[in-house]
């Protein structure tokens, strides 16, 4: 396995571990999720370039669109929660209440 793939998998693993360790704040969870999406995007782009399959070129672009939508929704949720509660602690939020 080439070194670039190992580095990207290491970046994904570190982001996943960060998501598990720093899950108390919503902002840190969103940053770790963005790191995971970025490493998946780079891996999909490299796989597409190596396979030379024309229809596979849409996969990285679709992942990038979903990552942008996820970031926009996550930041809107963060702003809404911080305006309502004054903090971004995940464990203090009970979103099932009216």
Curated annotation (Swiss-Prot):
Subcellular location as annotated: Mitochondrion inner membrane
Pfam families xref list: Oxidored_q2 (PF00420)
Parts forming coiled coils: none
GO annotation, biological process: ATP synthesis coupled electron transport
Entries under InterPro entries matching the protein: NADH_UbQ_OxRdtase_chain4L/K, NUOK/Mnh_C1-like
Segments passing through the bilayer: 1-21, 29-49, 58-78
EC annotation from Swiss-Prot or TrEMBL: 7.1.1.2
Reaction catalysis annotation: a ubiquinone + NADH + 5 H(+)(in) = a ubiquinol + NAD(+) + 4 H(+)(out)
Membrane topology annotation: Multi-pass membrane protein
Keyword Transmembrane: yes
Gene Ontology molecular function terms on file: NADH dehydrogenase (ubiquinone) activity
Keywords: Electron transport, Membrane, Mitochondrion, Mitochondrion inner membrane, NAD, Respiratory chain, Translocase, Transmembrane, Transmembrane helix, Transport, Ubiquinone
Keyword NAD (UniProt): yes
GO cellular component: mitochondrial inner membrane; respiratory chain complex I
UniProt family annotation: Belongs to the complex I subunit 4L family.
Subunit structure: Core subunit of respiratory chain NADH dehydrogenase (Complex I) which is composed of 45 different subunits.
Role played: Core subunit of the mitochondrial membrane respiratory chain NADH dehydrogenase (Complex I) which catalyzes electron transfer from NADH through the respiratory chain, using ubiquinone as an electron acceptor. Part of the enzyme membrane arm which is embedded in the lipid bilayer and involved in proton translocation.
Annotated protein name in UniProt: NADH-ubiquinone oxidoreductase chain 4L
Organism: Gorilla gorilla gorilla
């Amino acid at each position: 396995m080439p070194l670039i793939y190992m580095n990207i998998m290491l970046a994904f693993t570190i982001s996943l571990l960060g998501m598990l360790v720093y899950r108390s704040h919503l902002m840190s969870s969103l940053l770790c999720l963005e790191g995971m999406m970025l490493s998946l995007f780079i891996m999909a782009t490299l796989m597409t370039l190596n396979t030379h399959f024309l229809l596979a070129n849409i996969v990285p672009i679709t992942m990038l669109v979903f990552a942008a939508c996820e970031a926009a929704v996550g930041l809107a949720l963060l702003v809404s929660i911080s305006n309502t509660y004054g903090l971004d602690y995940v464990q203090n939020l009970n979103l099932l209440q009216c």
